[in-house]
Every structure is written in structure tokens, then in C-alpha cells.
Amino acid sequence: MATKKAGGSTRNGRDSEAKRLGVKRFGGESVLAGSIIVRQRGTKFHAGNNVGMGKDHTLFATADGKVKFEVKGEKNRKYVSIVAE
């Protein structure tokens, strides 16, 4: 005979892996073309001059230079640009 009652099962106990999103290169930092600047879901930051956007909304440098964050436009959108050094 069992000396301990069988434990019930649970439907919890799972969590997804962290996706490591966020800003990877901050304002004023020097970057090379192809460097990832921001990993994001959706367009929290928009691509400015010398910045490209991947299909998962990742922003990356298309030229060498320094990172510049700015708020522009009627809707106060945040833009990331690369300024040539």
C-alpha cells in the first residue's frame, strides 16, 4: 500500500524565454554599419537617417557614425539616426 497520497497535477509551471529586447547602443556611441541599435516589438523607435529596419522591427545602422536619439513630428515619435563622424 502507498504510504503517501498521490500528488495532483498542475497546469501551471511554464514561462517563455526572455527575448533580450531593448536599446543595444545608446546615444553618442560609435557604431559600424550593420550594428544592431534597438531590438523591439513594434515601432517604439522609428528609423531615421542611416538606419534600417528589419522584418522584426529591429533597427540597425546602415553607415558608420554616432547614434542619435531624437523626438520629432506632430506625434512626438522617437527616431534613431546615425550621424557621420
UniProtKB/Swiss-Prot annotation:
Coiled coil: none annotated. The keyword Glycosyltransferase does not apply. Residues 1-20 are annotated as: Disordered. GO terms for molecular function: structural constituent of ribosome. The keyword Ribonucleoprotein applies. Keywords: Ribonucleoprotein, Ribosomal protein. GO terms for biological process: translation. It comes from the Bacteria. GO terms for cellular component: cytosolic large ribosomal subunit. Belongs to the bacterial ribosomal protein bL27 family. This is Large ribosomal subunit protein bL27. The lineage of its organism: Bacteria, Pseudomonadati, Pseudomonadota, Gammaproteobacteria, Pasteurellales. The gene is rpmA.
